[in-house]
Amino acid sequence: MTKLEVCCYSVDCAQIAEKAGADRVELCCGQSEGGLTPSVGALIQARETVTIPVHPIVRPRGGDFCYSSNDFTIMKNDIARIRDLGFAGVVVGVLDTDGHIDMPRMREIMSVSGSLAVTFHRAFDMCQNPMIALKQLAELNVARILTSGQQQNAELGLALLKDLVAATKDQGPIIMAGAGVRLTNMQKFIDAGIRELHSSAGRTVPSTMRYRKAGVTMCADSDVDEFSHYCVDGEVVEAMKSLLVMGSPLAKHT
């Protein structure tokens, strides 16, 4: 049966996702940056309160995936901490200046990761040649690749996703579709034979604050709503998981 990973930007969201039936959580912070490394406090709290597999992302900053020496050392330190805390896996990715997998650095990451299941994240979608990147990641023995098929969303990238699934049919990383995967389009990915789906399955929720200071934001964008935040929608996760169960070969023959 196709598995559902839910992208969570807080431990609260991870707990909601677990209760709603998610198979796994990708734990991040920094939604506006597309996902950054969660704090040590968040890692510890997730480890203590969430029982399904949690894979924290290790991404020290927004922007591209070609990192400075300091960035890379920080990443290795974060991976070591995640490993030592006993998480099931980690989500990471490093490219070189020409848009290829940075093999020397990824070998270091695989070594530091130890027994962690490594997901190569959507840095894959910024690679110059996806099939060469796939071969390199298979050589590294990464567990899975999170990808939109090198398009802005995974539905637009279905053609490449199908090619990647076909190329890994017998062996190689699991292809996990992500970016714009929703209840309304997930059947397309199931029909394409994709084994794992990644979704934020979320909504914007209002602040609980009664007093709301007007005219001040915490960033350069003065139009940002400081009195709302993004959160996993448990009902959406439940509905997505139900569709996955009903769409499985076993369910169709019972």
Curated annotation (Swiss-Prot):
A cellular component term, taken from the record's GO annotations: cytoplasm
Domain of life assignment: Bacteria
Compartment annotation: Cytoplasm
InterPro entries in the record: CutC-like, CutC-like_dom_sf
Gene3D superfamilies, alphabetized: Copper homeostasis (CutC) domain (3.20.20.380)
MF (Gene Ontology): copper ion binding
Keywords in alphabetical order: Cytoplasm
Pfam families cross-referenced by the UniProt entry: CutC (PF03932)
Major location (coarse): cytoplasm
Family per similarity comment: Belongs to the CutC family.
UniProt name for this protein: PF03932 family protein CutC
Naturally occurring in which organism (per UniProt): Yersinia pseudotuberculosis serotype O:1b (strain IP 31758)
